[in-house]
């Protein structure tokens, strides 16, 4: 091989080795509808295998934001791919889509096959958890654009559902019950604030065990817990009950995301104390001296996904969610108005 490209900072052989390492991870995501073989110029999927009468494709793209910086600091790269898949898949599931396939994009300052394999392993783990196939992607070595130990990660998810089954929120009415599904932690939003509080202002080391928060373990790892994937519990709920609307609680927290599913003239009324707030949020509130409004405007506060359904259907929704291994809580209701209204306090209900 010519050394000219390598002298410019691009190691082609390392790229080939990374692709070899990816193969087994990609193959375990295979599902009905996948066509072609690993390494083709484009990923292919046979939509006819789904037997949908009026199929509608629903797509989403996203990244992981500055949570990547934390992965660099901890030097842990095998779960950040789960975050990438979750950020894309949870959005399309909120509109009723069954995830079908996923494509990833990794841009690095230096191609390190072992690190790339760990990143793609996480992506594949997320695909397996959500039922999507990893049918393509791009790994680009970009010396001069990224530092040698840095990378960026983004993805693109495509799902499908019957045209008649699209979840738009248009059917939400006053009196509908709001069912929240538990989050696993901070997920993938708010990390610029997290890093400022924890590492800039408080100057904790990533492996620090913080006094009075010893139960969290090393703080860096507690903050790296991957985003929960909601595809299976939410799709089960959509089959089991008459669901009127869904919201993925991502950037902007409750204040921005719950109104996204609401028809004009309706608001969400949230009962604080109706679910356990995760300890990691108590830690961030304490160390960052944050007001409650800031918390609910940035973080998921322990609820990563919200379903709106008629009161008579709420038990069916909760049973379907919990049958798929997730915790569900009745957290409020739909009222006349606009935005989000909070009632009560959490009364120290922390886990």
From Swiss-Prot:
Pfam families: AIRS, AIRS_C. It catalyses: 2-formamido-N(1)-(5-O-phospho-beta-D-ribosyl)acetamidine + ATP = 5-amino-1-(5-phospho-beta-D-ribosyl)imidazole + ADP + phosphate + H(+). It comes from the Bacteria. It is found in: Cytoplasm. Its EC number is 6.3.3.1. CDD domains: PurM. One of its GO terms (cellular component) is cytosol. It is an enzyme of class 6 (ligase). Keywords: ATP-binding, Cytoplasm, Ligase, Nucleotide-binding, Purine biosynthesis. One of its GO terms (molecular function) is phosphoribosylamine-glycine ligase activity. Pathway: Purine metabolism; IMP biosynthesis via de novo pathway; 5-amino-1-(5-phospho-D-ribosyl)imidazole from N(2)-formyl-N(1)-(5-phospho-D-ribosyl)glycinamide: step 2/2. One of its GO terms (biological process) is adenine biosynthetic process. InterPro entries: PurM-like_C_dom, PurM-like_C_sf, PurM-like_N, PurM-like_N_sf, PurM_cligase. Belongs to the AIR synthase family. This is Phosphoribosylformylglycinamidine cyclo-ligase. It comes from Lysinibacillus sphaericus (strain C3-41). The lineage of its organism: Bacteria, Bacillati, Bacillota, Bacilli, Bacillales.
